[in-house]
Amino acid sequence: MSDMFPHNPLRFDARGLSASDQVKLYRQLLLPRLIEEKMMSQLRQGKISKWFSGMGQEAISVGVAAAMPEDQFIFPMHRNLGIFTTRNVPLDRLFAQFQGKDYGFTKGRDRSFHFGSREHRIVGIISPLGPQLGLADGVALAEKLDGTGGCSFVFTGDGGASEGDFHEAVNVAAVWQLPVIIGIENNAWGLSTPSEQQFRCAHFTDK
């Protein structure tokens, strides 16, 4: 399994970031981690029924949400809590959603997925993940036709990249030259399916 990931050291380049910027980013990284720890604790206590953890992946969500203009749409996955916290979605509504309460975005029926916030330009998560890419293409097409200069950002995983929707959306985006960014988070699992059962190459990037 370790061979799936190239062993390149991470390097952080802080040039262009003030001390206050770095503190702000750190706090934005810390918040979803603290929420994750709380929800994992509640899961073990039986206070919630399900939780898709994104621990260790916070920097991806926070970095994207911090870099994207707030008026442009993001299509997150079920492990992208940092998108919601960085875009300042009210925490009381988030916790209500996670805990199955009426005040949640879908009255809590969908727990940590299938909900979004138009106000915060976050599109509700689609379970199979692949179909999200086509929707992001559509938003990008609207941005292009309207001449806004904006773009959309859509997340998928290594498992989602095995779906036919992924290849169709990538092809359409390329042919129509759409302003869409596709971010693939590779955690080596498509839910319970390991990478070696998804593709036959040494590294995911070869795919």
Model segments located where?
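Short, ordered loop/turn segments at secondary-structure junctions
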Residues: 79, 185-188
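Active-site flanking residues adjacent to catalytic metal/cofactor-binding acidic residues
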Residues: 157, 184-185
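Conserved acidic/glycine
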Residues: 1-60, 67-68
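Short, proline-centered helix/strand-breaking motifs
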Residues: 179-182
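Cofactor-binding active-site loop characterized by glycine-rich and histidine/acidic residues
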Residues: 37, 41, 46-176, 193-206
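A short, structure-level motif marking secondary-structure boundaries and short turns
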Residues: 10-11, 23-24, 153-155, 189-191
